[in-house]
Design a protein with these regions (language model features):
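Glycine-rich ThDP/TPP pyrophosphate-binding loop and its adjacent helix/strand module
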Residues: 49-61, 103-238
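Thiamine diphosphate
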Residues: 1-141, 202, 206
Length: 238
């Protein structure tokens, strides 16, 4: 897709996020909106996936570590054709399969249930390790929040991923510097994020997470990186 096509798709996803959260009268629109361009590039350009066969064995995997931004993931999956866009207005409604956090048992295209912050990277690392063990070519992507990486489990997983040289793993950090309690750097600063991942043997790329030229270049660089996992620190607007 061209950048213009990606931008148009991302804007459609943003519209769906607002519609879904408005229908639910609750949810997390901010982090969903800040991640929209990342979601768009992953699902429409980067990942090897098939909406008609969501459990395809050799598909690339995605783990939404910051599971509270489910409206962003759901809107992307619907736009990509995993389920009808009309279902988005049932977000968080009683009886809907689209609840407040992703559920791998009920939502097509969701590879892992998530929501408890800090745990998604560990799951993604496990998936990547299994891929290496089984000699598979699939890649594993996970999206974390900059507030989420205040959780210690993130760094345990990062240490192991770097030690095992999981070059089939890409961690994207949505660096919007906002969490519920305030500015991330004032609540409990994780900065400099890039230096921390580098210390655990990650290849680190800093980008504007709302610029498709930079997003495209970063994922290309990640694919070309061998012998270590990649962390993309994406500065976004929330």
């Amino acid at each position: 897709m061209t950048n213009l096509e990606l931008e148009k798709t991302a804007n459609e996803i943003r519209k769906s996020i607002v519609t879904a959260v408005h229908s639910a009268k609750s949810g997390h629109p901010g982090g969903s909106l800040s991640s929209a361009d990342i979601f768009t590039y992953l699902y429409f350009e980067e990942m090897n996936i098939d909406p008609k066969n969501p459990k395809m064995e050799d598909r690339d995997r995605f783990v939404l570590s910051k599971g509270h931004v489910a409206p962003g993931l759901y809107s992307t999956l619907a736009e990509r054709g995993y389920f009808p866009k009309e279902d988005l207005v049932t977000l968080r409604h009683t009886g809907s399969y689209l609840q407040g956090h992703p559920d791998m048992k009920h939502i097509p295209g969701v590879d892992m249930s998530s929501g408890s912050l800090g745990q998604g990277l560990s799951v993604a690392v496990g998936m990547a390790a299994v891929g290496k063990y089984d000699k598979k070519d699939y890649r594993v992507y996970t999206l974390c929040g900059d507030g989420e990486i205040q959780e210690g489990q993130i760094w345990e997983a990062a240490m192991w991923a770097g030690f095992k040289k999981l070059d089939n793993l890409v961690v994207v950090v949505d660096n919007n510097n906002l969490q519920i309690d305030g500015a991330v750097d004032e609540v409990c600063s994780p900065y400099p994020i890039d230096k921390k991942f580098e210390a655990f043997n990650f290849h680190v790329i800093n980008i504007d997470g709302n610029d498709f030229d930079q997003i495209r270049a970063a994922f290309k660089e990640a694919r070309e990186t061998k012998g270590m996992p990649t962390a993309i620190i994406a500065k976004t607007v929330k």
